[in-house]
């Protein structure tokens, strides 16, 4: 499943794992994507939506 929000196009951010031993490796910060059934132009549709958009009310379920 793609970790991209269909509403705001939020996608994963990238950074570093930095443990105490300082061995730095790459990591991904994935957005909290939920698969919800929403109405788009009067028809129900399944969308990948981040929880920020759900809380903001940008999606009608």
UniProtKB/Swiss-Prot annotation:
Signal peptide positions on this chain? none
Instruction: List UniProt keywords, sorted A-Z.
Output: Ribonucleoprotein, Ribosomal protein
Pfam families, alphabetized: Ribosomal_L28
Q: Keyword Iron-sulfur, does the record have it?
A: no
One GO biological process this protein is involved in is: translation
Q: Which domain of life is it from?
A: Bacteria
Q: Which InterPro entries match?
A: Bacterial_rp_bL28, Ribosomal_bL28, Ribosomal_bL28/bL31-like_sf, Ribosomal_bL28_bact-type, Ribosomal_bL28_sf
Q: Name one GO cellular component term.
A: ribosome
The GO terms this record gives for MF are: structural constituent of ribosome
The keyword Glycoprotein is assigned to this record: no
Query: What NCBIfam families does the annotation carry?
Result: L28
What family name appears in the similarity comment? Belongs to the bacterial ribosomal protein bL28 family.
- Name of this protein: Large ribosomal subunit protein bL28
Which organism does this record belong to?
A: Nocardioides sp. (strain ATCC BAA-499 / JS614)
- The gene that this protein is the product of is rpmB
